Curated annotation (Swiss-Prot):
Cellular component per GO, a single term: membrane
UniProt KW Transferase keyword: no
Family: Belongs to the G-protein coupled receptor 1 family.
Gene Ontology biological process terms, A to Z: G protein-coupled receptor signaling pathway; sensory perception of smell
Subcellular location: Cell membrane
Membrane topology: Multi-pass membrane protein
Gene: Or7a42
The UniProt record lists the keyword Membrane: yes
Parts of the chain on the Cytoplasmic side: 47-67, 122-135, 224-240, 294-310
Disulfide bond annotation, renumbered to this chain: 98-190
Protein name, entry field: Olfactory receptor 7A42
InterPro entries for this protein: GPCR_Rhodpsn, GPCR_Rhodpsn_7TM, Olfact_rcpt
Keywords of the record: Cell membrane, Disulfide bond, G-protein coupled receptor, Glycoprotein, Membrane, Olfaction, Receptor, Sensory transduction, Transducer, Transmembrane, Transmembrane helix
Amino acid sequence: MESGNSTRRIPSFFLLGFSENPHLQFLIFVLFLSMYLVTVLGNLLIIMVIITQSPLHTPMYFFLANLSFVDICFTSTTVPKMLVNIQTQSKAITYADCISQMSVFLVFAELDNFLLAVMAYDRYVAICHPLYYTFIVNQHLCILMVLLSWVVSILHAFLQSSIVLQLTFCGDVKIPHFFCELNQLSQLTCLDSLSSHLIMNLVPVLLAVISFSSILYSYFKIVSSICSISSVQGKYTAFSTCVSHLSIVFLFYSTGLGVYVSSAVVQSSHSAARASVMYTVVTPMLNPFIYSLRNKDVKKALERLLEGKL
């Protein structure tokens, strides 16, 4: 005799993607495959340049190499599964795979968030306390900050996964997205729990606000320090070291904010998926170009690497 409370039916999960139109699937496949390859190759090139070129063996580029690695993993969490689903003409994803994808995505999303804050702190010390820079931002501190970012990101993902595993889904779960995203899963439960929804929605926002606030504080001190420099050339030199990082910060947080605004304002089942493309795919793809085009040290290192290969 089977008790209704003793067993729990595992629902079927489906990723609806961007469009139900079958004629658009090939175009979407080619577009995302191209962006994924550019993302992986571009970030791998940045990592290779930093590892092989000794002038780039500094804290600033140590953090950049970590950011490039995280961006590769960040995109690899979502895009390959979407490409496989398009290729096989299947929208299905298992419950275990969905939870795993959501958890891993959360880890790398928060790592991006924390690493941008760490990089802002690095620029703050370099510009505001240049005489003590090598003493303060030493190898031990660099490794410690990266490890701490990993630990907090993993703990956050574990917390969210634990909550999602307790949620009840009624019937088949059709996710209007191209990956298992936390906010989408929280909206598809059939038994609402106010405390669970508060944690699922507020904790990521709180972590983002903390990191963004630390970035704002770092740049407030940086701007104050730059304004005190008397020479125009000195101001330009100091600020030029921050331009690439500022560009990435703007892309990351503006596109992330756009996802939440779009999903809240636009009442479309696929609006959140389309908006999140900038946040999850385009930004990691553009990061290597921003650093290679705007950063003289990286451009010179790239030239030396290419000359050595030819």
